[in-house]
Regions:
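Juxtamembrane regions of bacterial inner-membrane/periplasmic proteins
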Residues: 1-225
């Protein structure tokens, strides 16, 4: 009987491992990111808009280089070097979780954030973290870094009903992305950490401090001098 149980456990382990490995090579569906629907009259004049999430997707090449670097500096400056998972961050996060005896540290790369926000939920459980790592690997296998970065920038919630960079620029500055100055770009990058707390409408002092932190981080990363 012991031998039979041993064989069964080996079989189940191999089956589960094989299923997971096969699953890695199946691409994920495109993330569901609701966009704005526009209604025009016969003269092509905009009448009204409808949306669940106020979002207008953009291509990565529409994002100014300075703005891209601002996000990389504060969110994941090694994004283009790693494969979606930063072992150093994970070890640091695991240590903090162990010392606090609860899941408090995110340690998320840009790819992990996209996996969590586009496909999973915000629950801080071991199971969800394992799912997040699995989806992260799948994203890295089936999409280029630029595609992942583009999805990430279109997916972020910036507060005040604004989803994605384009709508965020319009909401906070009434500008197109190409018309933003460097301080405005740094502010948008800083909002991703906590749009409710760092909103210039709600907490202008915290927004200014966060903008300064983003610029300082860009200096440390060598993006600006």
């Amino acid at each position: 009987t012991n031998i039979n149980w041993r064989k069964l456990l080996v079989f189940l382990s191999l089956f589960i491992s094989g299923s997971l490995l096969c699953g890695l090579y199946l691409p994920l569906p495109a993330p569901k990111m609701p966009v704005v629907s526009e209604v025009y009259d016969s003269r092509h004049q905009l009448l009204t808009t409808f949306f669940i999430e106020n979002r207008s997707p953009i291509n990565l090449n529409e994002v100014p280089p300075f703005l891209r670097k601002a996000f990389l500096a504060v969110e994941d400056h090694r994004f283009y070097q790693h494969h979606g998972i930063n072992p150093g961050r994970i070890i640091k996060a695991a240590w903090r979780d162990l010392t606090q005896r609860r899941l408090i540290e995110g340690a998320s790369t840009i790819t992990q954030q996209l996996a969590r926000n586009a496909y999973l939920n915000q629950k801080r459980t071991i199971i969800r973290k394992i799912q997040e790592l699995y989806y992260t690997i799948k994203l890295e296998l089936h999409r280029t870094k630029d595609q992942i970065f583009e999805l990430y920038l279109n997916q972020i919630y910036f507060g005040h009903g604004a989803y994605g960079l384009k709508v965020a620029a319009e909401t906070y500055f009434n500008k197109k992305l190409s018309g933003l100055n460097q301080a405005e770009m740094a502010l948008l990058a800083g909002l991703s950490k906590g749009p409710a707390f760092y909103s210039p409408y709600i907490n202008p002092q915290a927004a200014r401090k966060r903008t300064s932190e983003v610029l300082q981080r860009m200096v440390r990363c060598g993006y600006i001098t």
